[in-house]
Amino acid sequence: MSIEGVFREGFVTTSLDAVINWTRTGSLWPMTFGLACCAVEMIHAGCARYDLDRFGVVFRPSPRQSDLMIVAGTLCNKMAPALRKVYDQMAEPRWVISMGSCANGGGYYHYSYSVVRGCDRIVPVDVYVPGCPPTAEALLYGIIQLQNKIKRTNTIAR
């Protein structure tokens, strides 16, 4: 949290934007949208070795309880409407991480007739995590980048 000044009396001054964004970065609740092998690495990131809980990232089973969607794997044309439906059920503000080459741009199956060439054609993506499959460290880095992006946003209209 960016603190503009600390007084001798023990007062802290900051902006309301900084406080709201600080609370949002400390409580990201992702919903997994695992479609292929990248989902296994996403599960690794949630286990004890990487421990996403220390960053305030707690996986939720329902889109109504989550504010972050991690799309991991090959998105087919048949699955695209379901992805959009789940995204629309999420509460505002909501963010999306695209994990892996297949979710980013179609990956190995880019030229297949049934593959969507990137999930950003269906939902707006905030952070892209490259790799085939990306490691758990790469996903962790992507989540930290998303937290930094959230800290920089203005939540209150001026």
From Swiss-Prot:
Cofactor annotation: [4Fe-4S] cluster
Record's keyword terms, sorted: 4Fe-4S, Cell inner membrane, Cell membrane, Iron, Iron-sulfur, Membrane, Metal-binding, NAD, Quinone, Translocase, Transport, Ubiquinone
Any one Gene Ontology cellular component term annotated for this protein: respiratory chain complex I
GO molecular function: 4 iron, 4 sulfur cluster binding; iron ion binding; NADH dehydrogenase (ubiquinone) activity; NADH:ubiquinone reductase (non-electrogenic) activity; quinone binding
Membrane topology classification: Peripheral membrane protein
Pfam families per the UniProt record, alphabetical: Oxidored_q6
Name this polypeptide is given: NADH-quinone oxidoreductase subunit B
GO terms (BP aspect): aerobic respiration; electron transport coupled proton transport
Gene field: nuoB
